[in-house]
From Swiss-Prot:
Residues that hold ADP according to the record: 42, 44, 83, 392, 396-397, 703, 922, 925, 951
Residues covered by the ABC transporter domain: 426-641, 667-993
EC number(s) on file: 3.6.4.-
HEAT repeat feature ranges: 5-42, 45-80, 86-123, 124-162, 166-203, 205-241, 242-279, 285-323
Record gene name: TEF3
Organism for this UniProt entry: Eremothecium gossypii (strain ATCC 10895 / CBS 109.51 / FGSC 9923 / NRRL Y-1056)
Protein name: Elongation factor 3
Stored CDD domains: ABCF_EF-3 (cd03221), CD_eEF3 (cd18626), Ras_like_GTPase (cd00882)
Pfam families referenced in this protein's UniProt entry, alphabetically: 4HB (PF17947), ABC_tran (PF00005), HEAT_EF3_GNC1 (PF24984), HEAT_EF3_N (PF24987)
Biased composition (Basic and acidic residues): 987-999
EC category: hydrolase
Localisation per UniProt entry: Cytoplasm
Function: Ribosome-dependent ATPase that functions in cytoplasmic translation elongation. Required for the ATP-dependent release of deacylated tRNA from the ribosomal E-site during protein biosynthesis. Stimulates the eEF1A-dependent binding of aminoacyl-tRNA to the ribosomal A-site, which has reduced affinity for tRNA as long as the E-site is occupied. Assists translation termination by stimulating the release of nascent protein from the ribosome by release factors.
Length: 1044
C-alpha cells in the first residue's frame, strides 16, 4: 500500500463514498474498502491518513454506523494485511465507547465489530488489545459497554487461550470487580466471562474446585469451606500464573480468617503450591499479597503447631520468590514489557530509522515480541513466523530476518534465568529418556523432571530423607513412571531391603525357583557363584543373617537377566567382605544400576553418575560421590558425617540409685552362652562384658557371626542358655532392632503421636512386654514353687507388691500361700491375709522369682517420676529432638512416612522413657547422610551408654572407644575400661529440681522442698514461741507445722 497520489485518490474517493452511503449501500462500500486495503498494492507503506479519517468517522454520529461496519469488514477479511492489523487494533477504544451508544443500531454494530477485531488479530499480539479492553471495563459507567467488553474478553479466551493464561494475574482483579457490579446484567456477564477465563487454568489439581473458587469471589462467606476442600488436595501439577491468579484471592482471604484452622490450611496450601512453581517470576506478582498475611499470622497465632506450619509456608514462599532476608521483594522482570522490547528494537534500528507513520506497526511488533518472551518462546523459526510479516512492512525480507534474529537474541538475554546446568551426558545407548511427575500421598516429590539412563552405567540416587528415593524406585519397578520403558522393552528389577516374612520357612533354593528364573541346576550354580554353600542353599531363609538375605535378593535379581537393577540400600547388613564383592560385581557385570545408599565409600567405588534431588527435580552430575560434592558443596554431609547441620538430641537418662560414677557397671554378663533349639552348637559362647553410662561400644564382625544374638540376650529378647546377665534394677534399655520397622509395622494406620500414646499408655513399654526375660516359662514356674520358712510356717510366694531400701540393697513386700499337709496327698496351699505379708531381701528372691522382682523394679522406676505426660505437645517436642516435624507427628499416618522418617519415629519411641543405655543394631540403614551425622553427634553427647552393631567404620570411628569383635560365636573385647565397684571419675549427683514430674497415668507429682534442719538454738526459740502462744490463747490455741 502507498500514500502515492494514486492510492490517496482511490482511498479518498472510497471514503467520500462511505460518508454519503445510505444504510442500503454502505455494506457494499465497506466491502470495497476492505478489499482495497488488504489487496496486493505497493509495498513498504501504510494507510495512515485513511485510518485517521476513519477514527473521526467513528466519533461522528452521522457516519459512526458506516465507519464501524467498514472496520468490521476489514477485520473479517480472510487475509488481513499486516500493514492494516495494527491500525485496526488502535481503533478498539473508540469501538468500545460506541458499544454503549444511545443508538441501539450503533450499539449492535459496535459490539459485532469489537468481536470481529478480537477474532482477527494474531493471538501473540494480545498485549496490545487486552489493555484497551480492561481499561474500558474499569473506566466506563455504561453497563452496555461493560457487557460488550466482557463478551469480547470471552471471545479472546477462545482465540488466544495460551496467551490469556499468562495475562490472568492482571485480568482476574478486573473481572472480580465487574462481578461486584450493582447492575444484574453486568454481574451475570462478568461471572460467565470469569468462568470462561478460568478455562485457561490448566491444572488438574484445582480444576474441579474452580466453580467454588469463582463463587468465593462473589460470596466471601464461602472462603472457609473452600479452603477446607482445597486443604485435602494433593498438588502435583506445575503451578502457573493462571493457577495462582485464581487461587491467591482465596488464600489471601483465608489468611485473614478468624479461625486458626483456616489460617493454618491456607499456609499449608501456599507451602504445597509454591513448591511447584518453576520460575520465581511466576510468583513475583503475588508476593505483596501473600507475604504480609503469612508474616502477620506467624506473629499473632497462639497455637505453636499452626505457627510452625505458617513459618514453613513463609520460608517456602521466600525461597521460591527469591525474597531477601529483610523481606525486600525482588523486582518483577520487565523482560516481557512492551516498553522493554520496544527499546531493544529502537536500539537495533537506530542506524536505519523507521518513519513516524509506522509507529503503530513498530509498537505491534514490540507487543508480539513481549508475548513471545513471556511464553519463553526463544526458537528462531517461531520468531520469524510471528514477526516477519510485520517487519517486512518497512524492510525487505532478508534485512527483516537479520534484524529479527538480533532482536530475538537481545530480548531473550533480558529473561531472568536460573543456574545453567552443563550437559552431563556422554555417548551410549539410551535405556530411558522420559519426563514425569511423582507424588506420594499428599506430598509432591518430583515435578516435570527428566530421567535419562544409558546402558551399562551406574547411577547413585541421592537426596534427604523423605525426598522420595525409595518411592521413585518402587514406582519405576511397578510401571508407574510416565514414559519409562515397559518390562517387555527394558527388564527392570527392584531389590528391596527385606525378604517377605511369609517366605521365612522356604528354603533358599525354593525361594529363588519361585521367581521363574531358570532350572534348579542353573539357580544352584548361580548361588554358588554368590558364595552360598550347599548347606546354605538347603537352609530355610529365616536361618540366614541380614547380610546373606540381602545377598540372596541380589542373586535372585541377577538371575532375572535385568537391564536395570534398582538397588535400595544394598549394603545394609553386608560385612566389609561382601561389600567388596558387591562393588566388584556391579563394576564388572555391565548392567545399568540405580543405587540408593547412605554408604559414601560404596557410592564412591561404584557410581559413574550421581542423580540428585534438587527442588522437585532430578539433576545429574557426572562422576562419583566425591566429584559430586566438589560440584555441589552444599551436599558435603553426604561425604562427611560431621558436616551435617541437622541436630538430634536424646533425653537425659534418669538417676540410678547406687550408681555414683559413669564407670560403674549397670549391665554385667558373665560366662554367658546361647544356643538356638535344634542347632548343633551354641551361636555364642563364653561371653563376658559389662556396660556403664560411659560405654561407647562398637560390635563388629562378619555376617552370621552372632552379633545380633549377643545383643538380643543383653536386652532380654532372648534368655541365655548358660551364664548370668545382671541389669541394674532401675536401668532402662532402648533397643532399635536390625529390622527397625518391626516396631511399627502393625501400626501403619496410626499417626506417630497415636503410636507413642498406644505404646506407653499403661506406663510401661508395650513393645517390650513379650521379651523373653519377662515371660514366665516352665523353668521359672518350677523354681517359683520354692518353699520359704517364715515365722515357723511353710510358705510359697503368691505375689510381690512393693519395694523399699534395705541396707545396700532392697527388700520386697510379698504375699503368700500357706502350705498344709506338705508331701501328702492332701497337700494344699491356702492364700494368706494381707496382714501376713512379709518383707524379704532381694538376695533371697532373685534366685527363684527374678522375673517377678524385675516387674516390681520397673513399676517402681516409673512411679518415681520418670514418666512423661502423653500429651500432643510433649510428644511433638520429643520427636522434634530427633528430626520429625509436628506436621508429620500429629497429622500424617505412619504408612505415608519415608523409610528414614520411620527410623526417626522408632528412635523417638524407643527413647521416650529416657533410657540409660541405647542399643542400635545397624543404625545406618535407611537414614540419610544428614540424619546419620546428626545421630552421630547426638550419641556423642548422650549422657548414657551406647552400643552399636554396624559394618560402617565411618559411623563409629569417632564415636566408639570400645570394640567387641565377634567371630564364630566368640566375642573378643578391646579398648574397654571395666571396673569393679564405682571406679574413678566425677561423682554423679541426683538432680532434685528436674522440672515437673508425672506418675504413670500422666498426673503431676507435687514435690515439696526439703525442710532445712534447725539447730538446737532455733528449736529452743520455736518452743518458747509455742509456749507463749499457748499461754495467751489458752484452749483456743492450735499448733501448726511451721511452729516445729
Amino acid at each position: 500500500m502507498s500514500d502515492s497520489a494514486q492510492s490517496i485518490k482511490v482511498l479518498g474517493e472510497l471514503f467520500e463514498k462511505l460518508s454519503v452511503a445510505t444504510a442500503e449501500n454502505r455494506e457494499a462500500t465497506a466491502t470495497e474498502i476492505a478489499s482495497f486495503l488488504n489487496g496486493n498494492i505497493i509495498e513498504h507503506d501504510v494507510p495512515e491518513e485513511f485510518f485517521k479519517n476513519l477514527t473521526k468517522a467513528v466519533k461522528d454520529k452521522k457516519t459512526a454506523a458506516a465507519a464501524l461496519e467498514t472496520i468490521a469488514h476489514i477485520a473479517n477479511e480472510n487475509n488481513l494485511s499486516p500493514s492494516v492489523e495494527p491500525y485496526i487494533v488502535d481503533l478498539v477504544p473508540e469501538v468500545c465507547v460506541k458499544t454503549g451508544d444511545k443508538d441501539k443500531d450503533v450499539q449492535s454494530i459496535a459490539s459485532e465489530t469489537l468481536l470481529a477485531i478480537v477474532k482477527a488479530i494474531d493471538p501473540v499480539a494480545i498485549k496490545v488489545i487486552l489493555p484497551h479492553l480492561t481499561k474500558s471495563l474499569v473506566t466506563t459507567n455504561k453497563w452496555q459497554e461493560k457487557v460488550s467488553v466482557l463478551a469480547a474478553i470471552s471471545a479472546l479466551v477462545d482465540a488466544a487461550k495460551t496467551q490469556v493464561a499468562l495475562r490472568m494475574p492482571e485480568l482476574i482483579p478486573v473481572l472480580s470487580e465487574a462481578m461486584w457490579d450493582t447492575k444484574k446484567e453486568v454481574k451475570h456477564a462478568a461471572t460467565a466471562t470469569m468462568t470462561k477465563a478460568t478455562e485457561t487454568v490448566d491444572n488438574k489439581d484445582i480444576e474441579r474446585f474452580i466453580p467454588e473458587l469463582i463463587q468465593c469471589i462473589a460470596d466471601p462467606s464461602q472462603v472457609s469451606e473452600t479452603v477446607h476442600l482445597l486443604g485435602a488436595t494433593t498438588f502435583v501439577a506445575e503451578v502457573t500464573p493462571a493457577t495462582l491468579s485464581i487461587m491467591v484471592p482465596l488464600l489471601n482471604r483465608g489468611l485473614a480468617e478468624r479461625e486458626t484452622s483456616i489460617k493454618r490450611k491456607a499456609a499449608v496450601i501456599i507451602d504445597n503450591m509454591c513448591k511447584l512453581v518453576e520460575d520465581p517470576q511466576v510468583v513475583a506478582p503475588f508476593l505483596e499479597k501473600l507475604l504480609p498475611g503469612l508474616k502477620n499470622n506467624f506473629a499473632t497465632i497462639a497455637d505453636p503447631e499452626a505457627r510452625e506450619v505458617t513459618l514453613r509456608g513463609l520460608k517456602t514462599l521466600r525461597r521460591v520468590g527469591n525474597v531477601s532476608d529483610d523481606d525486600t521483594l525482588p523486582e518483577v522482570s520487565h523482560a516481557g514489557d512492551i516498553v522493554t522490547t520496544r527499546g531493544v528494537l529502537d536500539e537495533l534500528t537506530k542506524d536505519t530509522p523507521i518513519a513516524p507513520r509506522f509507529a503503530p506497526v513498530v509498537n505491534y511488533i514490540a507487543a508480539i515480541a513481549a508475548d513471545l518472551i513471556d511464553e519463553r518462546i526463544i526458537d528462531q523459526q517461531a520468531w520469524f513466523t510471528h514477526v516477519t510479516p510485520y517487519m517486512t512492512v518497512f524492510f525487505h525480507e532478508k534485512q527483516s530476518k537479520e534484524i529479527i534474529d538480533d532482536f530475538r537474541k537481545r530480548a531473550v538475554d533480558n529473561i531472568p534465568v536460573g543456574p545453567n546446568f552443563d550437559d552431563e551426558e556422554d555417548e551410549g545407548e539410551d535405556l530411558c529418556n522420559c519426563e514425569f511427575s511423582l507424588a506420594y500421598g499428599a506430598k509432591i516429590l518430583l515435578n516435570k523432571t527428566q530421567l535419562r539412563l544409558k546402558r551399562a552405567r551406574r547411577y547413585g540416587l541421592c537426596g534427604p530423607n523423605g525426598a522420595g528415593k525409595s518411592t521413585l524406585m518402587r514406582a519405576i519397578a511397578n510401571g508407574q513412571v510416565d514414559g519409562f520403558p515397559t518390562q517387555d522393552e527394558c527388564r527392570t528389577v527392584y531389590v528391596e531391603h527385606d525378604i517377605d516374612g511369609t517366605q521365612a520357612d522356604t528354603s533358599v533354593l525354593d525361594f529363588v525357583f519361585q521367581g521363574d528364573v531358570g532350572t534348579r541346576e542353573v539357580i544352584t550354580e548361580k548361588l554358588r557363584e554368590f558364595g552360598f554353600s550347599d548347606e546354605m542353599i538347603a537352609m530355610p531363609i529365616m536361618s540366614l543373617s541380614g547380610g546373606w538375605k540381602m545377598k540372596l535378593a541380589l542373586a535372585r535379581a541377577v538371575l532375572k537377566n535385568a537391564d536395570i537393577l534398582l538397588l535400595d540400600e544394598p549394603t545394609n547388613h553386608l560385612d566389609t567382605v561382601n561389600v567388596a564383592w558387591l562393588v566388584n560385581y556391579l563394576n564388572t557385570c555391565g548392567i545399568t544400576s540405580i543405587i540408593v545408599s547412605h554408604d559414601s565409600g560404596f557410592l564412591d567405588n561404584v557410581c559413574q553418575y550421581i542423580i540428585h534431588y534438587e527442588g522437585l527435580k532430578l539433576r545429574k552430575y557426572k562422576g562419583n560421590l566425591s566429584e559430586f560434592v566438589k560440584k555441589c558443596p552444599t551436599a558435603k554431609s553426604y561425604y562427611e558425617l560431621g558436616a551435617s547441620d541437622l541436630e538430634f538430641k536424646f533425653p537425659e537418662p534418669g538417676f540410678l540409685e547406687g550408681v555414683k560414677t559413669k564407670q560403674k557397671a549397670i549391665v554385667k554378663v558373665s560366662n554367658m552362652s546361647f544356643q538356638y533349639p535344634g542347632t548343633s552348637k551354641p551361636q555364642i559362647a563364653d561371653i563376658n562384658f559389662q556396660c556403664s553410662l560411659s560405654s561407647r561400644i562398637a560390635v563388629i564382625g562378619p555376617n552370621g557371626a552372632g552379633k545380633s544374638t549377643l545383643i538380643n540376650v543383653l536386652t532380654g529378647e532372648l534368655l541365655p542358655t548358660t551364664g548370668e546377665v545382671y541389669t541394674h534394677e532401675n536401668c532402662r534399655i532402648a533397643y532399635i532392632k536390625q529390622h527397625a520397622f518391626a516396631h511399627i509395622e502393625n501400626h501403619l494406620d496410626k499417626t506417630p503421636s497415636e503410636y507413642i500414646q498406644w505404646r506407653f499408655q499403661t506406663g510401661e513399654d508395650r513393645e517390650t512386654m513379650d521379651r523373653a526375660n519377662r515371660q514366665i516359662n516352665e523353668s521359672d514356674a518350677e523354681s517359683m514353687n520354692k518353699i520359704f520358712k517364715i515365722d515357723g510356717t511353710p510358705r510359697r510366694i503368691a505375689g510381690i507388691h512393693s519395694r523399699r531400701k534395705f541396707k545396700n540393697t532392697y527388700e520386697y513386700e510379698c504375699s503368700f500361700l500357706l502350705g498344709e499337709n506338705i508331701g501328702m496327698k492332701s497337700e494344699r496351699w491356702v492364700p494368706m491375709m494381707s496382714v501376713d505379708n512379709a518383707w524379704l531381701p532381694r538376695g533371697e528372691l532373685i534366685e527363684s522369682h527374678s522375673k517377678m522382682v524385675a516387674e516390681v523394679d520397673m513399676k517402681e522406676a516409673l512411679a518415681s517420676g520418670q514418666f512423661r505426660p502423653l500429651t500432643r505437645k510433649e510428644i511433638e517436642e520429643h520427636c522434634a529432638m530427633l528430626g520429625l516435624e509436628a506436621e508429620l507427628v500429629s497429622h500424617s499416618r505412619i504408612r505415608g512416612l519415608s523409610g528414614g522418617q520411620k527410623v526417626k519415629l522408632v528412635l523417638a519411641a524407643c527413647t521416650w522413657q529416657r533410657p540409660h543405655l541405647i542399643v542400635l543394631d545397624e543404625p545406618t540403614n535407611y537414614l540419610d547422610r544428614d540424619s546419620l551425622g546428626a545421630l552421630s553427634k547426638a550419641l556423642k553427647a548422650f549422657e548414657g551408654g551406647v552400643i552399636i552393631i554396624t559394618h560402617s567404620a565411618e559411623f563409629t570411628k569417632d564415636l566408639t572407644e570400645e570394640v567387641w569383635a565377634v567371630k564364630d560365636g566368640i566375642m573378643t573385647p578391646s579398648g574397654h575400661n571395666w571396673v569393679s565397684g564405682q571406679g574413678s571419675g566425677p561423682r554423679l549427683e541426683k538432680k532434685e529440681d528436674e522440672g515437673d514430674k508425672f506418675d504413670a497415668m500422666g498426673n503431676k507429682i507435687a514435690t515439696g522442698n526439703k525442710k532445712k534442719k534447725l539447730s538446737s538454738a532455733e528449736l529452743r526459740k520455736k518452743k518458747k514461741e509455742r509456749m507463749k502462744k499457748k499461754k495467751e490463747l489458752g484452749d483456743a490455741y492450735v499448733s501448726s507445722d511451721d511452729e516445729f
